[in-house]
Design a protein with these regions (language model features):
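Signature of alpha-helical transmembrane segments and their immediate interfacial
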Residues: 239, 304-409, 535, 828, ...
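Small-residue-enriched core segments of transmembrane alpha-helices in multipass membrane transport
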Residues: 155, 166-187, 267-284, 312-324, ...
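Hydrophobic transmembrane alpha-helices and their membrane-interface caps
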Residues: 151-219, 259, 277, 742-830, ...
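Surface-exposed amphipathic alpha-helical segments in non-transmembrane regions
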Residues: 9-23, 42-75, 98, 102-125, ...
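Transmembrane helices with small-residue packing motifs
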Residues: 185, 189, 258-265, 347-355, ...
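Juxtamembrane "pre-transmembrane" interface segments
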Residues: 1, 65-67, 79-155, 194, ...
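Helix-loop junctions and hydrophobic alpha-helical segments within the transmembrane domains
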Residues: 128, 135, 139, 214, ...
Length: 933
């Protein structure tokens, strides 16, 4: 170009002016109006080579004499491998609000069809990092847990209420869920994991209203001899107020959770919403559907099973079985055989041999034993000692929690499904260099995993593109970054292999790579939160911030060597390499050259200037003009390129090398500066190593930086996960206070008293004994967020039974019972519903708490039921389930024993106060006899 006196712009103009189609207007020939079209669009690459280029000085040349015209792709800035083999990756991102599972199914079908019809045999398409897999498994686990919980709840109800009544009550679950499903679409709710868990949590609570109504109907119908219609009306009316109040108190704790702020609140908002809808639906079912079922089907005695009825039932069961076999729908036949078998088993063995003896012998014995316990507890001053004993237990449990309590975390940590090894080389490192380092990391990871590891599904390596956090996908190319992703098989297929151990093995194997930042991490199982360790240093002067940052790093990692810190990584990039072109403005002005001219000339030489687009069929390809590769990698060679411009004085074209007016200075600069609240901020972040507690590690860091002397106007603050945890703890504490206030208002309205609601609400405080003792004894990790939600939810569940018990005791007193007898009889009559509602809630949560999984679809299709303990959902939701199980188990004892004792204490205190006022009035009357006249 320089020798012949041409510039890149000359070539660009020439190619652009030739590759055009121009409409010349309409022309009339032989009476026909035709559009005059000048067609000059290139049809092959040779035409580009033969374009004539005219220079500013009148010189002429072909493009082929000035440049090499080649068909090529963009410069490779990213690399990808799957299990060591080169691959091309295609990331498919789901639109917001669309069904993930449906999208995954459609993609899988399209890929399978394309594989068969379009691809050669030696080319395969593999779907990796399929997020729908985890979603399917979690949903299946939770749905199976719902079924197991429903079965357990129905079984326990059968013993207390009989099979028919248990089925009436059990129907409350699907009916309430159905009503909730009708409402959810109007709220734009999707069926996600949180929604599924909300339904699981509601299983045991849903049946509470139905248990109280049906049990009361059954008692009046069978024991009092009242006809079924009258018994149904009386039973529903008798418990209407306490049931409605109980439902409202159960709902009360969930209302504050609707206003949970931030991303965590957006994640959990489905939980209180679905529970409020479902529990409201359960109230409708209990008072509209269940009474109808009771009137139609409830009998004092089992119906006589005559031959005709038995033949009819057997005929239906046999027909369904044959239908299932003929149509190939095995599950229809299996369900038909199961239902027929259960019907016969119940008629001839379960009810007469198991349930009837339990109801006639064991349950009355249990009731008499309970009456004896109550009679003993409220004799003399024993009630005071019972309550005092519970208070001492509470104080002792809190002390034990402080001294020997379990670990506390923000969110529970589950066994990882993915392990990520993030590789970061110095800013400016070429993609090929980063790829060579990534290969070393990949080889070491493969060595640790071993060949054909049954726990590992795939190993994927990315360099440049797709090397960032999968939770925050960034499609920009970062040549200095790489990532190795290890995908593990589903939890049920790991056979006890703890995948978390691989993270430690990877860290140990990759410590010795010099000049490279290696971070080993796993996927986030909950809502998005900040880094486990996140230290923000804020101030005005950047150099001072850097100095403080370096002191903090040395203090924590070298001096104190605080355990658990993986690697403190700064978000401030200080060594971003830069080649700065400095223009001599005096020389440039003398030559008539502007800064823009120099800048655009360099940019076009490096990145290329698009002259035109070349069309091949339906595809368009940009025609880029830029200098050869060897020159693009040499800054001095680039500066020797000529600048072609017209001299204003003479009007002649001139060429001046850029080096005549500019020079290159090699330096480093900051990659970017963050600001927060108008102050510059530098952040140090790190993961916490396996086996270390995040809160304990952060406490050590907090104490360490508190003693660090820093200049005035500068601040060191722990943010990230710690800040989120503090905000969550404060919100849940506030939500608990609001919930208790709502519960108090509801109960004061019902009882028209303050003393009795406070009496019942003490069970909320005492139920913490069960929660804390459970976590201490079994050394379970306490989650601030998940356990906190459980404790808030527990508040409403606990007071429900207390309301039913106290309300019925008041009813008996109004009927003329003395207080002591009313307490004993009220407790005995309400013993069944109290135990049943507690047992239903506990058993409904047990499958999730222990992680019991049975694949019922596989079971009814006579395939492997895949029975196993543990799952990803258990690790996350388990603390919530256990907090309710522990708390409610202890609260049931409180309701049955301690609440009657406190009721008796309240009565004796009120009685003494009345006697005291009466004696005072009598004394005043004796001393002042004229006062009555």
């Amino acid at each position: 170009l320089q020798a012949l006196g041409f510039s890149i712009d000359d070539i660009s103009r020439a190619i652009g002016s030739e590759n055009v189609n121009v409409s010349g207007g309409d022309v009339v020939t032989d009476g026909v109006r035709r559009n005059l079209q000048v067609s000059g669009e290139f049809t092959n690459v040779e035409q580009i080579k033969n374009v004539v280029v005219k220079g500013g000085k009148g010189n002429v040349a072909y493009v082929r004499d000035l440049a090499d015209v080649v068909e090529t792709g963009k410069e490779q800035q990213s690399f990808a491998r799957l299990d060591g083999k080169e691959v091309v990756t295609l990331a498919v991102l789901k639109k917001a609000g669309e069904n993930l599972i449906n999208a995954a199914d459609q993609i899988e079908a399209i890929v399978a069809d394309y594989q068969k019809t379009e691809l050669p045999k030696n080319c395969t398409i593999v779907i990796t990092n399929d997020q729908s897999t985890a979603t399917r498994i979690n949903l299946a686990d939770l749905i199976n847990s719902i079924i197991i919980g429903f079965i357990l709840v129905t079984i326990v109800l059968m013993f207390f209420m009989g099979v028919q009544n248990a089925i009436f009550v059990g129907l409350a679950t699907p009916l309430s869920a159905f009503l909730a499903f009708l409402v959810m679409p109007s709220l734009d709710f999707t069926f996600n994991i949180v929604v599924t868990f909300a339904f699981l949590l509601s299983i045991g609570i849903i049946v509470d209203d139905a248990v109280v109504v049906i049990e009361n109907t059954h008692r009046l119908h069978t024991k009092e001899g009242i006809d079924i219609k009258t018994a149904t009306k009386w039973a529903a009316a008798e418990v209407f107020a306490p049931v409605v109040a109980g439902t409202l108190t159960t709902l009360a704790p969930f209302f504050p959770l609707l206003f949970w702020p931030g991303l965590i609140g957006e994640f959990f908002v489905y939980l209180p919403s679905v529970l409020i809808i479902t529990l409201t639906a359960s109230l409708i079912v209990a008072y509209i559907f269940n009474p109808v079922f009771a009137v139609d089907f409830m009998d004092r005695k089992p119906r006589v099973l005559n031959r005709r009825r038995l033949f009819f039932i057997g005929l239906i069961g046999g027909a369904l079985t044959v239908l299932g076999i003929v149509t190939g729908q095995t599950w229809i036949a299996v369900l038909a055989v199961f239902n027929l078998g259960f019907f016969l088993l119940n008629r001839f063995w379960i009810t007469p041999k198991v349930i009837k003896p339990f109801q006639d012998k064991w349950l009355p014995a249990l009731m008499n034993m309970y009456r004896s316990v109550l009679r003993w507890s409220i004799s003399g001053n024993r009630a005071w000692f019972v309550v005092l004993g519970v208070v001492v237990m509470l104080v002792g449990t809190v002390f034990l929690m402080i001294v020997a309590g379990p670990q506390v975390v923000f969110f529970p940590s589950s066994d990882p499904n993915y392990a990520y090894v993030y590789i970061q080389t110095p800013q400016g490192t070429d993609a090929e260099v980063t790829d060579s380092i990534t290969r070393i990391v990949e080889q070491r990871v493969q060595k640790i995993i071993g060949p054909k590891n049954p726990t590992v599904k795939s190993v994927i390596s990315n360099v440049g593109l797709g090397a960032g956090d999968p939770q925050n996908p960034d499609r920009t190319v970062t040549p200095h970054k790489g990532k190795v992703t290890v995908a593990f098989v589903e939890y049920s297929k790991r056979h006890g292999d703890f995948t978390g151990r691989y993270l430690t093995l990877f860290r140990d194997a990759l410590r010795d790579l010099p000049g490279v930042e290696i971070v080993v991490d796993k996927e986030n199982s909950g809502p998005p939160t900040g880094k486990p360790i996140n230290i923000e240093i804020s101030g005005d002067d950047l150099d001072t911030l850097v100095a403080i940052q370096d002191r903090v790093k040395v203090l924590l990692t070298d001096s104190l060597r605080i355990g658990g810190i993986e690697r403190l990584k700064s978000d401030l990039i200080r060594n971003k390499p830069e080649a700065r072109v400095v223009i001599d403005r005096e020389k440039a002005n003398r030559e008539g050259i502007s800064t823009v001219q120099v800048g655009m000339a360099l940019r076009n030489s490096l990145y290329g200037a698009e002259a035109t687009k070349y069309r091949a069929g339906e595809e368009e390809y940009p025609v880029q003009l830029r200098v050869k590769e060897d020159m693009r990698h040499n800054a001095d060679a680039l500066l020797n390129l000529p600048l072609t411009f017209r001299e204003m004085s003479s009007g002649q074209f001139r060429q001046v090398p850029m080096s005549a007016v500019a020079k290159v200075e090699y330096t480093s600069t900051f990659g970017g500066i963050n600001r927060k609240n108008q102050k510059r901020v530098v952040t140090l972040g790190s993961n916490v190593l396996e086996g270390f507690n995040t809160n304990e590690t952060n406490d050590q860091i907090r104490r360490a930086v508190a003693g660090l002397k820093i200049p005035e106007g500068y601040d060191i603050k722990l943010t990230g996960e710690q800040e989120d945890q503090q905000e969550t703890g404060e919100f849940l504490g506030f939500a608990m206070m609001v919930a208790l206030m709502l519960i108090l208002v509801i109960m004061v309205t019902q009882f028209n008293s303050v003393a009795k609601p406070i009496l019942i609400m003490t069970t909320v405080l005492f139920s913490l004994i069960g929660v804390l003792l459970g976590f201490i004894i079994f050394q379970m990790t306490v989650s601030i967020a998940i356990t906190g939600i459980g404790v808030v939810a527990l508040a409403g569940i606990v007071v429900r039974n207390g309301i039913v018990l106290v309300d019925f005791t008041d009813v008996l007193k109004k009927e003329g019972y003395r207080t002591r007898r009313a307490i004993i009889e009220g407790g005995a009559v309400r013993f069944n519903p109290v135990v049943l509602t507690a047992a239903a809630t506990i058993l409904g949560l047990i499958p999730l708490a222990v992680g019991l999984n049975i694949n019922f679809w596989e079971l009814i299709n006579l395939r492997s039921p895949q029975i196993h303990l543990g799952s990803d959902s258990v690790a996350f939701w388990g603390p919530l389930a256990w907090s309710i199980v522990f708390g409610l188990s202890f609260a049931t004892f409180l309701t049955l024993v301690v609440v009657p004792c406190m009721y008796f204490i309240l009565y004796t205190v009120q009685l003494r106060l009345r006697r005291s006022r009466l004696h005072r009035a009598i004394r005043e009357g004796v001393h002042n006899p004229t006062a009555h006249h």
